[in-house]
A protein has these predicted regions:
Chain A
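Glycine-centered hinge/linker elements that transmit conformational signals in sensory
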Residues: 190-194, 234-266, 310
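Conserved N-terminal structural module of periplasmic/extracytoplasmic solute-binding proteins
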Residues: 1-111, 121-127, 177, 314-316, ...
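Extracytoplasmic/periplasmic solute-binding protein
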Residues: 141-155, 160, 186-238, 282
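Short helix-initiation/N-cap motifs at beta->coil->alpha
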Residues: 75-84, 182-187, 264-278
Length: 449, 332
């Protein structure tokens, strides 16, 4: 029946029109959403950086826009937003990432751009000036550390080293660790038990914190320090039952069980060591050189803070791993790759890189910037001396490309607390971790192909 | 303009009016009912378009994802049919999380309804400063959940929280409130702390109970408890049913454990104490920590169906005990 002009639509027609409107609206929204890197006529291009707010100051951005003639737009790093932007086909031009665990993951999924041609013609980021830590951002389709470069680290630390507070050592009569010879992990734990201060069931001073940058990469590093590999040669499986991985896992579970520092079963409300260490409530903190950036801002704390070499396992090799190597990568579908590269060069080789190097927030990733590391004060000289000696033992613990580090960590977080409370043996924990993590890795390998 | 011109102009206008008349007469007349319908659709269309765009479309997309191995990043995902749903049936972590969520719902919903109703009864009495009490008791309900989470984390922190400070004063050792086995009790306390919402709705219901019925019962010698049980509760039963349904839906979807966690990051959320690792936490972890968008979408769809079933069951079993002042069948 033809509808009368002016008559109200039928219910069915109205719903159909609404659905049509919704689809049209969705299409319009999709077109409008996340418009990045569109050319800006007359004032250069726009480059979108997905970074943390403290990665770049507004002043540096303003200066860069002036110097490079490129408009820089920043978006706060958020994995859900990144996925939405990648899915939408409008990714940021440069994205923050942790080289040790993200580089191979993104490269294996074909979403990261190979940067070798850009490096080859760069006069700012010369290949012979790159610190070996940047190899964390290389991946040859099988192994991290080889093959094309997919990103670069902005700075780095050897994340198994630790800071200690001499005042708290003095108070409990514990000897300072050597500046040149590492303690064993067992000695470190023994010291932490002597340094911890408790009252009425409350911990007033943590003896030591040892949690690495994340449990998955920490356990990878600890296993390497015990002389083994957590992953099989093709990175498709973990093996916590090997003597070395079992030793590493057992040590970490012991650390949590004796409750000398923050852990899953004793969470620190500050979520990281910085504020607790700054408040003189932590005698040892497993943070690498980068924590110096925070310590240098508090002169009283700096006076009593020292950096110590990474511990070793009895009979294990002396290695000192980098668990982070945080930097930037360029999505394959970035719109303004050439402009993004100009920003990339500036971020890693010019003003921001110099500011990071002189602030003590990590070791510069260009050898030519090493001379800017802070060394004016006595304590800074001590820290630099220890750090320079430690660089001889620099090592990388390769990570699997088949799983997100958070995914492997989620399995650990679900299963391990029982072992930390003494309700499960370490051998049972190792078996359960193998089973659950290998299933996740198998799915990832199928996905990557 | 001369008189003749004016007259001519007027004549022209009249002619135009006359010519318009038949067109206006031909225009279909809109009945009042049709006008009402049109107004109804005009006023509801923003909501309906929003509903289609922001609810139905994402749900349909999530349903499609639940049949795939999509991980949010890789272009190499594939269609796997019902595999994600099959896996879900044998995933012990999912079942454990679902069990904890169910236990939380059957504990927290009755406790908050009883607590809210109790508070409503108290502030419905002729007290001095009744308005002040009502405001104070309702205040927690207007605190944003994130603020409540931060406040409770500070309050129950093992080493610096006021709760352990108070325990120490009375000679007790500090407890690890935010870890197992105590974390579940803190979660329950946060939920009960916000019972002001239930109090307000119950209070409105209480004020609708006819006073004459209470007076008649009193004259007949009924005790206060008997009056409450036999008059107040039956008359409040539709309100209680509403609170039960919305309470169950809210409790199975709660994200409060996340807000109470020490580290509310993608990886940190998976470190939530086991007793608080509820279904939505598992969904969150599967989406963002593990990156299994397909599996997590299947989890969400199963939850959606379970909520529908639970709501249906609540309506089915409440039909004999909910008393409607107005016959709900009257308009059928």
């Amino acid at each position: 029946m033809p509808s009368h002009a002016g008559a109200p639509p039928s219910r069915r027609r109205f719903l159909a029109l609404s659905a049509g409107g919704a689809v049209a609206g969705a299409a319009a929204l999709s077109g409008c959403a996340m418009q990045v890197s569109s050319g800006v006529s007359g004032s250069g291009e726009t480059v979108t950086l997905m970074i943390n707010p403290d990665d770049l100051t507004p002043e540096l951005i303003k200066q860069a826009q002036k110097d490079l003639g490129v408009k820089i737009r920043t978006v706060k790093y958020d994995i859900t937003k990144l996925i939405a932007m990648l899915t939408n086909g409008n990714p940021p031009d440069l994205v923050r990432g942790i080289g040790a665990v993200d580089a191979a993951y993104f490269a294996a999924r074909d979403v990261a751009e190979e940067l070798d041609p850009y490096f080859a013609r760069s006069s700012i980021l010369r290949l012979d000036d790159l610190d070996p830590v940047n190899d964390l951002w290389r991946y040859d389709g099988r192994t991290q550390g080889k093959g094309p470069r997919y990103g670069m680290a902005k700075d780095f630390s050897q994340d198994s080293m630790y800071w200690y507070n001499t005042a708290l050592f003095d108070k409990t009569g514990v000897d300072y660790p050597s500046e040149t010879e590492p303690v064993t992990y067992e000695e470190w734990l023994d010291n932490a038990e002597r340094l911890v201060q408790r009252k009425n069931g409350q911990t007033t001073v943590f003896g030591g914190s040892y949690n690495g940058l994340g449990k998955a990469i920490l356990l990878t590093s600890l296993t390497a320090a015990a002389g083994g590999n957590l992953f099989t040669d093709d990175f498709s499986q973990v093996d916590f039952s090997s003597p070395e991985a079992r030793k590493a896992l057992g040590w970490y579970i012991d650390y949590c069980r004796v409750r000398v520092g923050p852990s899953i079963i004793d969470p620190d409300p500050n979520t990281w060591d910085g504020p607790t260490y700054q408040a003189n409530r932590m005698a040892m903190s497993n943070c690498g050189y980068w924590l110096g950036g925070l310590i240098n801002t508090a002169p009283k704390l700096a006076e009593v803070s020292r950096l110590a070499p990474a511990p070793v396992f009895e009979g294990g090799p002396r290695i000192s791993t980098c668990q982070g190597g945080t930097g930037l990568w360029m999505p394959r579908k970035a719109r303004n790759k050439d402009a993004a590269w100009r920003v990339f060069e500036w971020f890693f080789g010019e003003a921001p890189a110099k500011a990071r190097a002189s602030g003590g927030w990590g070791i510069p990733t260009l050898k030519s910037l090493r001379s800017l590391m802070p060394a004016q004060e006595e304590h800074q000289k001590q820290v630099l001396k220890v750090q320079e000696a430690e660089l001889k033992h620099f090592s990388v613990a390769s990570f699997t490309p088949y799983a997100k580090w958070e995914g492997l960590e989620s399995i650990f977080n679900q299963i391990a607390p029982a072992a930390m409370r003494g309700d499960m043996s370490v051998d049972t924990l190792a078996r359960r971790l193998n089973s659950a993590m290998n299933e996740q890795l198998k799915r990832g390998k199928e996905q990557v192909g | 303009m001369t008189v003749g011109q004016i007259s001519s102009a007027q004549g022209g206008t009249d002619t135009a009016k006359a010519a318009d008349r038949p067109a206006a007469a031909n225009r279909p007349r809109i009945s009042m009912n049709a006008r009402r319908q049109r107004a109804f659709y005009m006023f509801t269309s923003p909501w309906i378009i929003g509903f289609l765009l922001l609810t139905i479309a994402p749900m349909a997309y999530a349903l499609w994802l639940s049949f795939t191995t999509f991980d949010g990043i890789s272009p190499h995902w594939r269609y796997v049919g019902l595999d994600n749903y099959r896996e879900l049936l044998s995933d012990s972590v999912t079942w454990d999380a679902l069990g904890r969520t169910g236990l939380f719902a059957i504990t927290s919903v009755p406790l908050s309804i009883i607590g809210g109703l109790g508070l409503a009864v108290l502030v419905n009495r002729p007290l001095k400063a009744r308005g002040l009490f009502r405001t104070l008791l309702y205040l927690p309900a207007v605190v944003p959940p994130v603020g409540a989470g931060i406040a409770f984390k500070q309050l129950f922190d093992t080493n610096s929280g006021a709760t352990n400070g108070a325990l120490n004063i009375f000679g007790f050792d500090a407890l690890g409130w935010l870890a197992d086995p105590y974390a579940r009790y803190v979660l329950l306390m946060v939920v009960l702390w916000g019972a002001g919402n239930i109090m307000i709705i119950s209070l409105a219901g209480l004020q609708d109970v006819p006073r004459e019925l209470h007076e008649a019962a009193r004259i007949d010698g009924a005790s206060a408890w008997r009056t409450f049980r036999s008059i107040t509760v039956p008359l409040l039963s539709p309100v209680l049913l509403f609170q039960t349904v919305t309470g169950v839906i809210a409790s199975v979807q709660t994200i409060m454990p996340l807000l109470l966690s020490a580290d509310a990051t993608t990886a940190g959320v998976t470190a939530i104490p086991q007793s608080n690792y509820q279904y939505m936490m598992h969904v969150f972890a599967q989406y963002f920590a593990v990156g299994r968008y397909g599996y997590a979408s299947a989890l969400l769809w199963v939850l959606f169906v379970l909520i529908l079933v639970a709501t249906g069951l609540i309506f089915r079993f409440s039909s004999g005990v909910v008393f409607y002042n107005v016959d709900p069948e009257a308009k059928k």
